[in-house]
Every structure is written in C-alpha cells, then in structure tokens.
C-alpha cells in the first residue's frame, strides 16, 4: 500500500465511542474541569460562526423576511474576516484521508454471510461498522488468487484519485496475511443490468437521465487519463431504490492509465457484448469506453444488444463486423437524435468515434431534458455555509472534508443535485466562474473578496472545485453527528490510542501528497494546527477537544 499500514486498537475505540469504561469517563470529566480553569489563548472563529448560525435558525423560523436582513447585516463582518485569508495558502488533498490498515477486519466490521456481488478480483459483502453502526460495502480479495498484484494495487490507486458523484467511494483499506479489503460506500438500489431485465427497455427521458451520468463519468475518467475498459450495465449500481437515484460506476479491476501521446493500450480486456473491435486486435485507445457506452445505450432503449450470437465466438465475430440495425418494432418510436448518438458511439473507426465531452453536447440531450436540467437554485444558507467554511481553522477544514467524504449520499442529496447542475461541461468538478454563475442565477449577491472565498473552497489548489471540496464547504452543520465527528477523529488518530499527535497529523496531511520528505516547516505548521485546538496544552488532541473544536457536545 502507498499509505502507512498500522495496527488498529479496538479496545481504545470502544472506550471512546461505545462502552466508555469508568476510567475514561473520569478522565473526560477531569479534562472538562481543567478546561474551565484554562483561559484559551486561541479564538475559535468557527465556533463563533456556529453559535451565530443557531441564532439565525431561530430568526428564520419566526420571521423569514427578517432572516435575510439579518444575514446581510453580518455579511460586512465576514467580508472583513475574509480579507485576512488572502495570504493563507494552506492546501491539502483528500487522497491522504483514505488510509490503509493491517489487522483483523472482523474486529471492526460485521460482514454479511452472502456476497452482494462479484468483481474482477473478489466478492463484495455488506458490512456494518461495529462502533458506529454505519453500513458499508467491503470487497474481499484473496492474495493467493491475485495473479497480478501490481494491477490490483493500481485499482486501489485509481480509486483513491477519483472524486465524482457517479463514482463509488473508497473509504479505507485493510490487509491481513491472506486477504485485502476495500471499504466502500454501500449502494442498495441494485444493478443497472437488473433494472433493464425488469423493465425490458427505458423511455428516452429516463434513458437521458442514465446516459448523461455515464458520459459524464467517462468524461471525468478520460480527462484524468483513465480508461475503465469494462463498461457494462453490471458495473453500474443505483445508490438507492428511489426513482431518481443516481448511478455509481464500480469495479476498476480492468481500468488502466493511458498517456497523452498515443493513447494506445494493448491488453485485451472487457466483456464480449460490449467490447470494442479495436480491443480484439490488441491496439486501442480510451474510446473503447465510448463503444461500450454505445452498446449499453442501444440496450436500454430496446432491451437487447446490437451484436449477439449463440456463443462468445459468434458475438465477437459480429462485433468485428460492426454491423447492427434499428429495424425492430422497439425502434419505431425512438427519436432520430437518439439513433444518431448511438451511431456516433458505434463508429468502427475510433478516430472518428465521438468522445464523452462531445456526447454530452449532442442535440439529443438538449431535446430530452432529464433530471440534470432542472432549474436548481442555491438558497442563501448555502452561500453562508461557504463563508463559514472559509473562516474555519485549518484542522476544522480537514475535519469537514473527511465528514463530507464519509457521509452517505442520503444526507447530501440536495447538495449533490446542485453540484451536478453547476457542472455544465460534465467534467466532474466546477470552475469558479460556474459557481459564480450559479449563485447569481439563484438571485444571491456575491460577497466582497469573492475570489478569496473561492480560493478557500479550492482546498487542493487545482483551480477547480472538486466534488468533496464543494460538499465540505456547503455542508450544513446540522449533519455533524457524533458518528461523523468520530469518523473524522478516527482518520487522524492513526494508532487509535484516543489522541491525535503531531506525527499522526503530519502523516495524514503530507504522506502520499508531498514530493520529497516532510520539512521542519511542515512540522511547525502541524504543531500550530494542534495548538489552535489543544485546550489543556498537552501537545495532543483528544476526542473531547476534537468535539469542542467542531462545537458538538460530548
């Protein structure tokens, strides 16, 4: 693993979050008592903001009109504070928060007896965190069955780099002597394949809802020089059972990086019905994913594949010829625009084949406006959350990012919809101009020092606002449950002894995200971050202090 592997101590975790033995309760009471007599030398701007938000909620419930006036009244004060952030160039990457551990997985998770499904390298099980009772999905891979360990490591590396609403989230990994475990977000809505079987085919409106997500995620992957190489309905899961559930792409076991020069890949990979002709020759590029998407598109409109046969050999023979038609009665009511988009995906010559970005701009999507094209508005509370986030302490920002990463999509449904609406070009992140346009279209007045605000939201300094960055900044504090607070604390507390040290925080912040070794300047910055919230001045942060920092009662 790229990240440091450590042993996790279950007994300490249980003491903090579940059973709380007497000695730990006494320890916490002692800390609370001592904290009262300590005059903190550090002001918590984030804490002030949290208290101010509680006042605003009361005002909003009693007098909505007065609420907006009250918001505007506080804007000048926050704008002044934002000016002081102009010189703050603190940047970090969420990749460092996806840790790898050694030890017995079943000390931390209860696994279901029956697998949810099978992937390229192993089975996926439903799992429940023993302490937090949060449900996850766990991919279990036997080391003995791994024929190509470097390729599997690449799958993990690829997943750590991805941050998109339509990509399954990797949360952490475990490893013991026999197996490797990938802990991921749990999808409960079933496979796209199963829905196709159940419905037979989709109407064009719903098909546009599905295909826009598929082309968007392919555009996101291809921009990052990643080719999935196994696009098929079995590799898309519905997040939940709702009618407008988003889909998530899974199983990056066959995914590969390609270079910017010739784009060529040579390993034969894929599934017969969906594989592109060039893959069969052993010389192809990233547009093999577009061919597969075209096949999938064809299937969801009519219920059967464009290339079929009694055996894999017959199917592949049909694929090589690339001949298909729209002659069945199922196609009588399908628009010419839909057929044209399929043709552009199923073009034999990959050089002339449409790419994902071009597909998203196809007239069919403009004609069949699906759920992504709804007139989404951001309310003033989202803008206030942006301002509040920009004024947080560094460690608070790190914690909010982890909380956004660990939260399930049920809690973030509205924000997720807003993000997808703002992502007009389907790149999986939004530009500062797109966010500005979204705020203006929602009738919200842009604050002074808006560029400073955007720079604070762009936590990795990429110039664009990624999905988790947006969620962390827009997330309402009402989602800060003790479970989510502990999820963040557990990431920082690498050895699980109940305290966050300078070494642990430096490891999380810089390991895997920094070229070269950690400098003294880096260490000093981490020490300062700890000092800002270390109320008893012992040089460490315990869970009580962490909760105080996030303004959640322990």
Curated annotation (Swiss-Prot):
Motif (J domain EF-hand interaction motif): 394-403
Organism listed in the record: Plasmodium berghei (strain Anka)
Residues annotated for Ca(2+) 1 binding in this entry: 458, 460, 462, 464, 469
Biological role stated in the UniProt entry: Calcium-dependent protein kinase which acts as a sensor and effector of intracellular Ca(2+) levels probably in part downstream of cGMP-activated PKG kinase. In the mosquito midgut, regulates the gliding motility of the ookinete which is essential for the ookinete to invade the midgut epithelium. However, another study showed that while required for ookinete invasion of the midgut epithelium, is not required for ookinete gliding motility.
Region feature Disordered, mapped onto this chain: 30-55
GO biological process, any: positive regulation of cell migration
Residues that coordinate or bind ATP: 116-124, 139
Binding positions for Ca(2+) 2 per the UniProt entry: 493, 495, 497, 499, 504
Gene label: CDPK3
Name assigned to this protein: Calcium-dependent protein kinase 3
Enzyme class: transferase
Keyword terms: ATP-binding, Calcium, Cytoplasm, Kinase, Magnesium, Metal-binding, Nucleotide-binding, Repeat, Serine/threonine-protein kinase, Transferase
Keyword Phosphoprotein recorded: no
């Amino acid at each position: 693993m790229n990240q440091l592997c450590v042993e996790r101590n279950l007994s300490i975790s249980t003491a903090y979050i579940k059973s709380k033995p007497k000695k730990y309760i006494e320890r916490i009471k002692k800390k609370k008592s001592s904290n009262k007599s300590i005059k903190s030398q550090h002001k918590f701007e984030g804490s002030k903001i949290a208290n101010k938000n509680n006042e605003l909620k009361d005002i909003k419930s009693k007098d909505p009109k007065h609420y907006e006036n009250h918001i505007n009244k506080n804007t000048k004060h926050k704008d002044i504070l934002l000016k002081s952030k102009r010189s703050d160039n603190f940047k970090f990457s969420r990749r460092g928060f996806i840790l790898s551990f050694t030890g017995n997985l079943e000390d931390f998770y209860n696994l279901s007896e029956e697998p949810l499904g099978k992937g390229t390298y192993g089975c996926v099980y439903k799992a429940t965190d023993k302490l937090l009772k949060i449900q996850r999905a766990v991919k279990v891979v036997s080391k003995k069955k791994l024929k190509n360990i470097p390729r599997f490591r690449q799958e993990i590396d690829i997943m750590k780099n991805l941050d998109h609403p339509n990509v399954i989230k990797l949360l952490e990994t475990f490893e013991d002597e026999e197996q490797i475990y990938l802990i991921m977000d749990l999808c409960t809505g079933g496979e796209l394949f199963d829905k196709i079987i159940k419905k037979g085919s989709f109407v064009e409106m719903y098909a546009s809802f599905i295909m826009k997500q598929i082309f968007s995620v392919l555009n996101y992957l291809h921009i990052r020089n990643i080719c999935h190489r196994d696009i098929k309905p079995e590799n898309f899961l519905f997040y939940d059972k709702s009618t407008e559930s988003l889909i998530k792409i899974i199983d990056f076991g066959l995914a590969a990086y390609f270079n910017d020069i010739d784009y060529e890949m040579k390993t034969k990979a894929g599934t017969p019905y969906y594989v592109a002709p060039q893959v069969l020759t052993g010389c192809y590029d990233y547009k093999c994913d577009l061919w597969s998407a075209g096949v999938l598109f064809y299937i969801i409109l009519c219920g059967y594949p464009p290339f079929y046969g009694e055996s894999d050999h017959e199917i592949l023979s049909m694929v090589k010829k690339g001949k298909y038609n729209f002659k069945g009665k199922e196609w009588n009511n399908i628009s010419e625009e839909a057929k044209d988009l399929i043709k552009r995906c199923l073009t034999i010559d990959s050089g002339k084949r449409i790419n994902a970005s071009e597909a998203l701009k196809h007239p069919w999507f403009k004609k069949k406006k699906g759920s992504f094209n709804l007139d989404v508005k951001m309310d003033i509370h989202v803008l206030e959350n942006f301002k509040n986030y920009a004024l947080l302490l560094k460690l608070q920002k790190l914690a909010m990012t982890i909380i956004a990463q660990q939260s399930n999509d049920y809690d973030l449904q509205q924000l997720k919809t807003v993000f997808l609406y703002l992502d007009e070009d389907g790149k999986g992140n939004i530009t500062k101009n797109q966010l500005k346009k979204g705020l203006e279209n929602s009738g919200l007045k842009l604050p002074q020092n808006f560029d400073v605000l955007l720079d604070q939201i762009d936590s990795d300094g990429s110039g664009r606002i990624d999905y988790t960055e947006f969620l962390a900044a827009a997330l309402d504090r009402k989602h800060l449950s003790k479970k989510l607070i502990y999820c963040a604390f557990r990431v920082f507390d690498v050895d699980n002894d109940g305290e966050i040290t300078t070494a642990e925080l430096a490891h999380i912040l810089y390991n895997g995200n920094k070229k070269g070794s950690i400098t003294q300047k880096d260490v000093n910055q981490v020490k300062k971050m700890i000092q800002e919230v270390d109320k008893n001045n012992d040089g460490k942060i315990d869970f009580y202090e962490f909760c105080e920092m996030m303004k959640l009662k322990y």
